[in-house]
Each structure stands twice: as C-alpha cells, then as structure tokens.
UniProtKB/Swiss-Prot annotation:
Tissue spec. comment: Expressed only in seeds.
Organism field: Oryza sativa subsp. japonica (Rice)
Listed InterPro entries: Granulin, Granulin_sf, Papain-like_cys_pep_sf, Pept_asp_AS, Pept_cys_AS, Pept_his_AS, Peptidase_C1A, Peptidase_C1A_C
Induction of synthesis: By gibberellic acid (GA).
Protein name: Oryzain beta chain
Disulfide bonds: 162-205, 196-238, 296-347, 386-398, 392-413
GO molecular function annotations of the record: cysteine-type endopeptidase activity
Gene Ontology CC annotation, any one: lysosome
Keywords, in A-Z order: Disulfide bond, Glycoprotein, Hydrolase, Protease, Signal, Thiol protease, Zymogen
Glycosylation sites: 341, 389
Family membership noted in the UniProt record: Belongs to the peptidase C1 family.
Role noted for this protein: Probable thiol protease.
Annotated PANTHER family: CYSTEINE PROTEASE FAMILY C1-RELATED
Stretches the record annotates as Disordered: 358-380
Length: 466
C-alpha cells in the first residue's frame, strides 16, 4: 500500500513538473505492436489514469484533441508516453542526461505530433547559401552568449495547430535585430506572414521558409505589429490595410555558411539567428529540461531561433527558442548539443541558418488601422405561417387555440419546432417527449415511460396584417 502511494505521488509530481515542458525524438510510432509492448511495464493502469486526470486538469480539460469518443484512445496514447518518459528519466538520472516530461503533447502519437506542429519547408532555399557572410573574419568569440539577458528576445509565443514555425522563427529574429539597432522591443505579426507572404515556398499553415519570409518583409517595406495584426493560427485572406502598416523594416538578410557550427556561432555571437532543425522525434516532442542529446536526423522540418550558446558541466550547447508556448521544455526553450563533431550540427541546426540585417531607423509610424467593418447579421428566419390570418415565429409550432368543427379560428404558438399540440388547447410537448398528460401538466417520452418533463405553454399567434 505504501509503495503504491509513493508511486502515485511520483506520477503526480511528474505530471505537475511537466506542465512547463515536452516533445520527443525517437520516431517510434504508436501502433498496435508498440502499444502492446509498452503496456507490459511501467506505471499501472490505475496510476496512469490518475496521472491522466491531473494532466487533463493542467491542460484546461484536454489537449488540442477532441476527447468525446476519443477519450479512451487518448488515454492509451498518454499511458504509452508516460511509460516512455518514466523509463527515459530513470536512465537519465543515472547518467545525468536530459529529462522528458508529460507536456501538452503527451496524448499525441508521434505521427499526430509531426503532422500538426511542424512546418519548415527545406527542399531548397530561394537563393544559394553563403553568398554573403559579414562575420566570416571574426575569430575571437565570447565563451557564452544569451540574448535573452540583453532584452533582445521577445517572450515565447505559441504557433498552435498550424505549421507556421517558419513565420515565428523569422519574426523573432526581426524583433531581435530591431531591438539591437533601435533599442525598442516591438512584437511583430506572424499572421501577416501566414496570410500575406505567399512568395517562394511559403504557404501559411502548410509550411514555409524563413528566407522567403525575410524577402517578403524587405519587398513589403516592413511588417506590422502583433497587436494590430494578431495571430489566429489559421490561414486567411491577407488584410491589405494591415499589410500596409509597415512598423519595423529590415535592410536584407544573410545565410550562414552551411554545415559549419563555427560560422553559426559567429553569427549567434552578434544576434539571434533563424535555424531549421529536425524536431519530429519522440524525445523532442516530450523534452523537458537539460542539454538535449536525443536521437534526431537532418530531415529539417521545424523553424526555430538560436538565441545563444554556452557550456554546462563540459557539455557545449545552443540555446534555442521554440514556438510551442512557455509550457514546453525550459520555459519554451531547448538547450541542444553543440560541437558534436558532425558538420550538420545537432538535428541539422547548422544546415540552414540565416539572419536579417538592419542598420537604420524604421519607417514613419503608420496611422491607426481602420477597424474592419462588422459582419452584417444574417437575415432573420421567416415566420411560420399558420393560415392566411395567423403566423408564429420561426422555430415554433402552430397549435390551434380555438376551433369550430374542422376550422381553426384562433392559433397559438408552441415555443419549439415539431411540437405536439395538446388537446387542452393551452399546452404542448417537445418532440423528444411527445405524449401529453394534460391533467398532470407533463409530457412523456412514450405512453408508459416514467420519463417526463413539464409541458410547455403556448402563446397567442401573431395576426397577419399585410
């Protein structure tokens, strides 16, 4: 009993601790064979269900997935991920490695996670990499850099269920270079890029390239603020008025020489840099803390930002800003291995890096964007015509209130559609309880059913005047 209580307490701590972490890196699919193998060990079903209930509460009643009939399947996915996290952390505690946690992605299979939250298109850049690189001659570099400490990085944002990571990466580096040049941190609009930047390979929530985002901002003469053009996490029509609100501009952008971590370090020593990585693995999905050394390849699928670098107990790392909200990883960041003797860098971080350039002031402050005109209300539904003289409101039922022989002289209205008109000429019953019990003033589901509701009262029908 004491052991069970201790195990349950451990699980609760695991879930609460993961309220600030999470993604994955082992590309293990959740299929029947994997699920069956995973359920043989680790937390019991009762412990997992208790942890799942707590996780649901921590995540506002559920993840981005509909629960309903999916509830049990979501639980089984959660249980399998819980075992994966538990086993990984047990090994990490022995070796001093990075830790995983049950974050907002904990009820997603790895396939679901990859399909929903990634979005960098990296088949080819819009220009050859390394045409120009201003930091090529730099040799002396600081041992560590963290642009967050300089106020040059905006708070972590959340791209939601939209493959717009490329827009978040590009906007973040533009925010940073603007702060470094002008001294003002202005949060900018990812939604403008999602909806208006259709140049090159950019296609909104279906992915894009940071270089093409920079190119759009240059050709557009600037980009609007997040406050004026807020993020919606869906594709939409470009708002021309807001697209023309050019608040922050850049002069150009440069690509870091590919497959060269030293060149990337030189760039990051001067400003935050947009980078692409492979982020679709299970360990990255559920990452919580520490220097990430998990499994990953170089199939670049996610745009992020390198905002610094450093060393922890002899482990060199990059500080990487993600766009999955502050409850993922280390308050929205991941520290990734650096100098791993692989030219591409960890998860391909040195393969496609670039940064915006800026030397002057921003465009003049634009006039306030006129408000979007309100959507006109839909036309009201037509009245329900009882006869030539009387009608009832839409969504109601005509019931005769006074008749003579087969002729109804006065009509009444029951407040629901498809109602049963009771013989007392004063009440009616909803369609789910169609049997009138006029003496009791109730309506039953069927003749002998014990289920009943209070009968509805009719109102007088409207006299047609036209």
């Amino acid at each position: 009993m004491a052991a069970r209580a201790a195990a349950a307490a451990f699980l609760l701590l695991l879930i609460v601790g993961a309220a600030t972490a999470a993604p994955d890196m082992s590309i293990i699919s959740y299929n029947a064979e994997h699920g069956a193998r995973g359920l043989e060990e680790g937390p019991t079903e009762a412990e997992a269900r208790a942890a799942y209930d707590l996780w649901l509460a921590e995540n506002g009643g559920g993840s981005p997935n509909a629960l309903g009939g999916e509830h049990e399947r979501r639980f089984l996915v959660f249980w399998d991920n819980l075992k994966f996290v538990d086993a990984h952390n047990a090994r990490a505690d022995e070796r001093g490695g990075f830790r995983l946690g049950m974050n907002r992605f904990a009820d997603l299979t790895n396939e679901e996670f990859r399909a929903t939250f990634l979005g960098a298109k990296v088949a080819e850049r819009s220009r050859a990499a390394g045409e120009r690189y201003r930091h090529d001659g730099v040799e002396e570099l600081p041992e560590s850099v963290d642009w967050r400490e300089k106020g040059a990085v905006a708070p972590v944002k959340n791209q939601g269920q939209c493959g717009s990571c490329w827009a978040f990466s590009a906007v973040s580096t533009v925010e940073s270079i603007n702060q470094l040049v002008t001294g003002e941190m202005i949060t900018l609009s990812e939604q403008e890029l999602v909806e208006c930047s259709t140049n090159g390979q950019n296609s909104g929530c279906n992915g894009g390239l940071m270089d093409d985002a920079f190119d759009f901002i240059i050709k557009n003469g600037g980009i609007d603020t997040e406050d004026d053009y807020p993020y919606k996490a869906v594709d939409g029509k470009c708002d021309i008025n807001r697209e023309n609100a050019k608040v922050v501009s850049i002069d150009g952008f440069e690509d870091v020489p590919q497959n060269d971590e030293k060149s990337l370090q030189k760039a990051v020593a001067h400003q935050p840099v947009s980078v692409a990585i492979e982020a679709g693995g299970r360990e990255f999905q559920l990452y919580h803390s520490g220097v990430f050394s998990g499994r990953c390849g170089t199939s670049l699928d996610h745009g992020v930002v390198a905002v610094g670098y450093g060393t922890d107990n002899g482990k060199d790392y990059w500080i990487v800003r993600n766009s999955w909200g502050p409850k993922w990883g280390e308050s929205g960041y991941v520290r990734m291995e650096r100098n791993i003797n692989v030219t591409t860098g960890k998860c391909g971080i040195a393969m496609m890096a670039s940064y915006p350039t800026k030397s002057g002031a921003n465009p003049p402050k634009p006039s306030p964007t006129p408000p979007t005109p309100p959507t006109p209300p839909p036309p009201s539904a037509p009245d329900h015509v009882c006869d030539d003289n009387f009608s009832c409101p839409a969504g109601s039922t005509c019931c005769c209130a006074f008749g003579f022989r087969n002729l109804c002289l006065v009509w009444g209205c029951c407040p629901v559609e498809g109602a049963t008109c009771c013989k007392d000429h004063a009440s009616c019953c909803p369609p789910d309880y169609p049997v009138c019990n006029t003496r009791a003033g109730t309506c039953s589901a069927s003749k002998n059913s014990p289920l009943s509701v209070k009968a509805l009262k009719r109102t007088l029908a409207k006299l047609n005047t036209a």
